[in-house]
């Protein structure tokens, strides 16, 4: 069964959670443009809400956008398992939540600062932009820095 859409009826840019989403892409793939939402949780949210995965993001109605927006803010309310969420067992209150956008960035910065206060090597390496998980750094992972070759004068 082939699902086709009419380009004349598509809203080309959809705004959800302060992010512009491409309206021509299918809903789960379009939702991955929101920072903190991956394909796994986007697909799970669409399936739990009963939204057709073949539908384009620009074809969504206002009620569908509202339901998706609410589900992104609180995935547990629609039955998404805790293992899908990106902030499990919070250090302060022990809750599990799903962070998106600037809340995710702020939480990452707080984690790095807390680690630097405790003198953790991982936090220092994250802060400087080096590899964290034991990879070698002599030849790979040189993005962002120019090694350059000095010219003979």
Curated annotation (Swiss-Prot):
Listed GO MF terms: rRNA binding; structural constituent of ribosome
Name of the featured protein: Small ribosomal subunit protein uS13
Database matches in Gene3D superfamilies: 1.10.8.50, 30s ribosomal protein s13, domain 2
SUPFAM superfamilies: S13-like H2TH domain
Role description: Located at the top of the head of the 40S subunit, it contacts several helices of the 18S rRNA.
Domain of life, per lineage: Eukaryota
Keyword tags: Cytoplasm, Ribonucleoprotein, Ribosomal protein, RNA-binding, rRNA-binding
Region (Disordered) residue spans: 134-153
Gene encoding the protein: RPS18
Similarity remark: Belongs to the universal ribosomal protein uS13 family.
Record localization: Cytoplasm
Pfam family, one: Ribosomal_S13
GO CC, alphabetical: cytosol; small ribosomal subunit
A GO biological process held by the record: translation
Lineage: Eukaryota, Fungi, Fungi incertae sedis, Microsporidia, Unikaryonidae
Keyword Secreted found: no
